[in-house]
Amino acid sequence: MPGRIFRRLPSLALLAMLAPVAAAQVREEAPPRPLPAEVQADVAAIAEHLASVQEEASPLACGKAVENARWGVETMLEVGEKNLRGGYMTQAAYDAATPTLKALLGVLTVQDCEAAAGVRRDFYQCMSSDYNHVYACGKAHSFEP
């Protein structure tokens, strides 16, 4: 399962970020709570911004990289939970996303960063910037954990 985490991270992260929009199309249990058009536009703009690497030239700083990556994953889990409670995400979508995101937390460690090479190191270097989101870095530097 860990080998698939980063390959699935972009779709899972986007699911958590776009749950209010996506839930309207996949909600099975009950009708979704509709979002006003301007809110849907804001969600799409935020998701697009979070999917883009903002700063590529940061030096590798493992403590900062792990802190940023873990914070990003934890935030996605919290947003998913809030969207589930608020009726914007189905239980099935939440159940599909959370195990992989929770497993990812176990992979993101300072020791892993310090031993990283290649694309894995590039991911941690990307996460060394406070301006980058874990979704963007995972998308730009996908690796097998």
Predicted features and spans:
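Compact alpha-helical subdomains of small soluble proteins
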Residues: 88-145
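Generic N-terminal simple sequence motifs
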Residues: 6, 16, 27-28
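Bacterial N-terminal signal peptides that target proteins for export
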Residues: 2-12
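Short N-proximal segments of mature Sec-exported proteins
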Residues: 41-106
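Boundary at the C-terminal end of the N-terminal hydrophobic targeting segment
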Residues: 22-26
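Bacterial N-terminal signal peptides
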Residues: 10-20
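Short N-terminal segments immediately surrounding and downstream of signal-peptide cleavage
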Residues: 27-44
